[in-house]
Amino acid sequence: MKGYHSCVMKGGVIGIPIIFMLLAGAIFSFANDDVVEDWLRNNSLVIESEDGETLPIQNNESWLVLIVDFSDSDNQQSSMISAAETMLIPHAQNYINELSHGTVDLEIDIHNVMFTAPNTMAAYGSDTGIKRDSDIDGTHLPMILAEEVIVEFSEAIDWSKYDLNADGSVDRLLILHTAIGQETGGDSNRIWSHFAMFQKPLNLPKGMISSHYAMASLGSESDGFGTAMHEM
């Protein structure tokens, strides 16, 4: 596909939720320690509405990965795309293959343009009191970043490829920011990796919508992979 770096794995079908399968694989790879699962549960966020639902893993999985930098950073686009490839390919496919016994087709598309956000990292990641990544009125700041990323690439992407059940909604979207995630020891101005449902779905071309996303860190290296898989 034009505009993407893609990697495909072939297979069949599996019927368990993707988040638990990927979490198990990430935990097994990066630490054979029971405390890792508890750590991930305690150090990542899930922001969603009560009736928010995500699609369980499908016969054919297609994931879109978008990369975002910040106005106070000077990361090179080629380096960040390469870092995303190193983090995800072929590791994500290998976990899917192992845990599904080769029964899932997984394609990962890493968009080949990096978006530079209009604001600093702290503008999207600062904590207010005990509220993670939120301003004083409770607004979840990284969701603003996610909206900016999606709007930026709205016309450049065939979003229908990531609608896995043909209901008009994007099912798999991973946004990778270039900084270190707060869950791996960053300061209080950094972004916690998370999964979130938009309060109101974003409109996309051709009648598509984006109702949720996962966000994780490129700067956290191997820890970033485990957390990214957890959030997906």
Features from the language model and the residues they span:
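N-terminal Lys/Arg-rich, disordered targeting/topogenic segments
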Residues: 1-9
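Active-site-proximal segment of zinc-dependent metalloprotease catalytic domains
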Residues: 2, 24-32, 36-232
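Hydrophobic membrane-insertion alpha-helices, especially the h-region
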Residues: 13-28
